[in-house]
Regions:
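ATP-dependent adenylation/nucleotidyltransferase module used to activate substrates
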Residues: 1-150
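Local cysteine-cluster metal-coordination motifs and their immediate loop/turn environment
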Residues: 77, 157-178
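Structured loop/turn residues at beta-strand edges in well-structured enzyme cores
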Residues: 86, 154, 168
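A short alpha-helix-loop-beta-strand transition element characteristic
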Residues: 150-156
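Adenosyl-5′-phosphate
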Residues: 181
Length: 181
């Protein structure tokens, strides 16, 4: 249901790079009720301001306009079910401190992670552990760790627009540029 599919092609490239199987399924119907600025059924424009500016606008009291309600909860629940079915031991997701700041993305907060970690563990009979290794790290620290590990950043995409090149103006472009500086 996103306005662009660029992240999907990048996910495929990254899975191929690491030689891992990528499993995907269409969850568009689940998000068809959300009309935030990221969704194709929305006429709202993606903000061309930094997350800090967006958080300032909301006074840190509500999510930013690119928040998809409970998206990570839905993704993590589905991933836990698939992981258990495939005899995996853990599900890992990339929540980080910057996304949790100022209530921007409530499903990236440490309290959300703790609640989901318990729910996933209990809901799978102790079969799946949820991990969020970046939950207390900012994007600059994550980029530094990725560079140390030789992450193929050229295969990644952060921009909320789906063009050939990042727009350089949306919150994710601005934060990515700052993280690499």
């Amino acid at each position: 249901g996103q306005k662009h599919k660029k992240e999907l092609s990048c996910a495929e490239k990254i899975a191929n790079y690491y030689g891992v199987r990528r499993i995907s399924f269409d969850v568009t119907p689940l998000f068809s009720y959300s009309h935030n600025s990221l969704m194709e059924n929305s006429d709202k424009a993606v903000p061309k301001t930094s997350y800090a500016e967006q958080i300032e606008e909301t006074k840190g009291q509500s999510p930013v306009s690119t928040y998809v309600p409970f998206r990570n909860g839905i993704f993590l629940s589905a991933a836990a079910g698939v992981a258990l079915s495939l005899d995996c031991e853990r599900v890992v997701y990339g929540a980080h401190a910057d996304d949790a700041a100022g209530a921007a993305y409530p499903d990236c907060s440490p309290s959300f992670f703790d609640a989901m970690k318990t729910a996933v563990y209990e809901g799978t009979g102790g079969g799946i552990t949820l991990k969020a290794p970046f939950i207390h790290m900012n994007k600059a620290d994550i980029v530094a760790e990725g560079l140390r590990l030789h992450v193929p950043y050229e295969l990644t995409w952060s921009c909320y627009e789906g063009g050939d090149k990042p727009c350089g103006l949306c919150g994710t472009c601005r934060d990515r540029e700052a993280a690499f500086a």
